[in-house]
Amino acid sequence: MISKPDKNKTRQKRHTRVRGKISGTADCPRLNVFRSNKNIYAQLIDDVAGVTLASASTLDKEVKVEGTKVEQAQQVGALVAQRAVKAGHKVVVFDRGGYLYHGRIAALATAARENGLEF
């Protein structure tokens, strides 16, 4: 019987493969993105110390719940960039979490770049 591969399992394989190659430091933290069906989450991570430096998601009160998911991802990208710059982090490494660079992930990344993050 032919079975379809589970999309989330293949994404997790991609993510672990990429995570072996990139990691965040205190000088250049990792901007990690997680996408669920309803929400999107972004956080700056210092992998050496194992600490989250800044985070934002669609569950935050600053993000408006109206609009499409792409618009919400843009708001989350702008918010995490503002919090990162406020904490003193401008240069980051973007970790798309095994997702394709398209749609919500690309919208979050471009909004973060427009609000002061460099990657």
Curated annotation (Swiss-Prot):
rRNA-binding recorded as keyword: yes
Basic residues biased stretches: 10-20
Keyword line: Ribonucleoprotein, Ribosomal protein, RNA-binding, rRNA-binding
GO cellular component: cytosolic large ribosomal subunit
Positions of region (Disordered): 1-20
Gene Ontology molecular-function annotations: 5S rRNA binding; structural constituent of ribosome
Record Gene3D superfamilies: 3.30.420.100
GO biological processes: translation
InterPro entries in UniProt: Ribosomal_uL18_bac-type, Ribosomal_uL18_bac/euk
SUPFAM superfamilies: Translational machinery components
Domain of life per record: Bacteria
Subunit details: Part of the 50S ribosomal subunit; part of the 5S rRNA/L5/L18/L25 subcomplex. Contacts the 5S and 23S rRNAs.
Matches recorded under HAMAP family: Ribosomal_uL18_B
Family: Belongs to the universal ribosomal protein uL18 family.
The protein, known as: Large ribosomal subunit protein uL18
Gene transcribed to yield this protein: rplR
